[in-house]
From Swiss-Prot:
This is Cysteine desulfurase. SUPFAM superfamilies: PLP-dependent transferases. It catalyses: (sulfur carrier)-H + L-cysteine = (sulfur carrier)-SH + L-alanine; L-selenocysteine + AH2 = hydrogenselenide + L-alanine + A + H(+). InterPro entries: Aminotrans_V_dom (IPR000192), Aminotrans_V_PyrdxlP_BS (IPR020578), Cys_dSase_SufS (IPR010970), PyrdxlP-dep_Trfase (IPR015424), PyrdxlP-dep_Trfase_major (IPR015421), PyrdxlP-dep_Trfase_small (IPR015422). It comes from Wigglesworthia glossinidia brevipalpis. Keywords: Cytoplasm, Lyase, Pyridoxal phosphate, Transferase.
Length: 410
C-alpha cells in the first residue's frame, strides 16, 4: 500500500517535540487529534488578516468571512454526503450537538409514556442529556446491553425497542473498546419495524472511516472538529431537513431571528441559522474546513486501511506482554483498552509519560463500561493517520519498563 507516512508525519509539527527529554509518542488520539501545519497556518491567516463578524456586516471582511463559513458548511455536507447544506449545524462539539437534539427535538416530540433507547457503551455525552430529558418528561430510558466481547447484544434489540420508543441513540465507534457498531444494519432493522428516530455519536468514527449519512439513514449525526485534526470548540450536528424544520430554537440571540418585536413576538430564522445563536467560532470553522481538506487529500479509505493494519500490529505486540488484560476482542478501529494486572492505570499513565508516551487512563467518560468490566479505570492507546510502527514499538518498550518498575511494589 502506497501510504505516505513520512510525509504525513512531517506535516504535524508536534510530533517533533520532546516530552521529558524523550521523543513524543502520541497515542491519545481518541481524546484529541493533533493539527497539521495547513490547519495551524490557515487559522493564523484568518485571525491576522481576515477576521470579522459573519452574517452582519456589508463590508468586505464581513462578506468574505461569511462566504468562507458557508462554503465550509457546504464542504462538510459533501464530506458526509448530506442532501443539503442546511442540514449542517455548527456547534461547539459532539456534546453540544447531542444536547441540542435532546433539548429541541426531544422536548417537542417526546411525551409521557414514551421511552428512549441508548446503549451500554455510550460516552457520558450520549447518556446524561437523555437522562436529564427523561427526568423532565417522565419517560423511561432502556439500554442495549454489552457482551463480554465488547460488542453490543444486538439480539436484544427486539426485546427492548417497542412502539413507544421515540429515539435510539448509539455510538458509531466506542471511545473505549474500539468496537465499530454495524450502524447501517442496525438502523435498517429498527426502521423496518418502527417509526423511530436515530442519533449517532460519530466522534470516534469521523476521522477513521467514510461517513455517508444518506446511506446510513440516520436522523442525526454528530462529531467534533478536534477529533478530525481540526480545532477544539467546533463541531457539527447533521440533521435531516424535514426534522430540523419542525424543531424549535434552543438558544436565543442574534443570528437566529428574522424579526424581534417587543409586543407581537419574534419570528425565527430558517435552518440551519435558527440553531446558531450569537457569534460563531469562525476561526474554528475555518480550521475545520482546512482539516477536512487535508483528510480528503490523503484519502479517508487509504487512512482507514493503513490504521487497520497498524492497530493489528499493535494488538499482536501488546498481546505478548505478560499479565496484561485487553478488554475487547472486537478491536476493529483505532483503539486498544487494557490494564496491567496488579497495576493501577493512573500509575501506568504517569510512568509512561516519563518516557514521552501519551496515553489515556481513567474511566474515559464511560463509567457504565467500567462497571460492566468490574474495573474503576483502564489504559487506552489510540492511533491516528500519522501514527506508525515505531510509535507502537516505543510504547511497548516503555510499557515493559513501567511494568518491571511497578512489579517491585506488588
Amino acid at each position: 500500500m502506497n501510504y505516505p507516512i513520512k510525509e504525513i508525519r512531517s506535516d504535524f509539527p508536534i510530533l517533533s517535540e520532546k516530552i521529558n527529554n524523550s521523543p513524543l509518542i502520541y497515542l491519545d488520539n481518541a481524546a484529541s487529534s493533533q493539527k497539521p501545519k495547513c490547519v495551524l497556518q490557515r487559522e493564523i491567516i484568518y485571525s491576522s488578516k481576515e477576521h470579522s463578524a459573519v452574517h452582519r456586516g456589508i463590508h468586505t471582511l464581513s462578506k468574505n468571512a461569511t462566504k468562507n463559513m458557508e462554503d465550509i458548511r457546504s464542504k462538510i455536507a459533501k464530506f458526509i454526503n448530506a442532501k443539503s447544506d442546511s442540514e449542517i449545524i455548527f456547534v461547539k462539539g459532539t456534546t453540544e450537538g447531542i444536547n441540542l437534539v435532546a433539548n429541541t427535538w426531544g422536548e417537542t416530540f417526546i411525551k409521557k409514556g414514551d421511552n428512549i433507547v441508548i446503549t451500554q457503551m455510550e460516552h457520558h455525552a450520549n447518556i446524561v442529556p437523555w437522562q436529564l430529558l427523561s427526568m423532565r418528561k417522565k419517560v423511561d430510558i432502556k439500554y442495549i446491553p454489552l457482551l463480554p466481547s465488547g460488542k453490543l447484544d444486538i439480539c436484544k434489540i427486539d426485546d427492548i425497542i417497542n412502539n413507544n420508543t421515540r429515539i435510539f441513540c448509539i455510538t458509531h465507534v466506542s471511545n473505549i473498546l474500539g468496537t465499530c457498531n454495524l450502524i447501517e444494519k442496525i438502523i435498517k432493522k429498527i426502521k423496518n419495524n418502527y417509526d423511530i428516530k436515530v442519533l449517532i455519536d460519530g466522534a470516534q468514527a469521523i476521522m477513521h472511516m467514510k461517513i455517508d449519512v444518506q446511506k446510513i439513514d440516520c436522523d442525526f449525526y454528530v462529531f467534533s472538529g478536534h477529533k478530525i485534526y481540526g480545532p477544539s470548540g467546533i463541531g457539527v450536528l447533521y440533521g435531516k431537513k424535514k426534522l430540523l424544520k419542525k424543531m424549535p430554537p434552543w438558544e436565543g440571540g442574534g443570528g437566529m431571528i428574522k424579526k424581534v418585536c417587543l409586543f407581537s413576538g419574534t419570528t425565527f430564522n430558517e435552518i440551519p441559522w435558527r440553531f446558531e445563536a450569537g457569534s460563531p467560532n469562525i476561526s474554528g470553522i475555518i480550521g475545520l474546513g482546512k482539516s477536512i481538506e487535508y483528510v480528503k487529500k490523503i484519502g479517508i479509505k487509504k487512512i482507514q486501511k493503513y490504521e487497520k493494519k497498524l492497530i493489528k500490529y499493535a494488538l499482536l505486540k501488546i498481546k505478548n506482554i505478560p499479565n496484561i488484560k485487553i478488554y475487547s476482542s472486537e478491536i476493529n478501529t483505532s483503539i486498544i483498552p487494557f490494564n496491567l494486572k496488579g497495576c493501577h492505570s493512573y500509575d501506568v499513565g504517569i510512568l509512561l509519560d516519563k518516557y514521552g508516551v501519551a496515553i489515556r487512563t481513567g474511566h474515559h467518560c464511560s463509567m457504565p463500561i467500567m462497571n460492566f468490566f468490574k474495573v474503576h479505570s483502564m489504559c487506552r492507546i489510540s492511533v491516528a493517520m500519522y501514527s506508525d510502527e515505531s510509535d507502537i514499538d516505543n510504547f511497548i518498550k516503555s510499557l515493559l519498563k513501567v511494568q518491571k518498575f511497578l512489579r517491585r511494589f506488588n
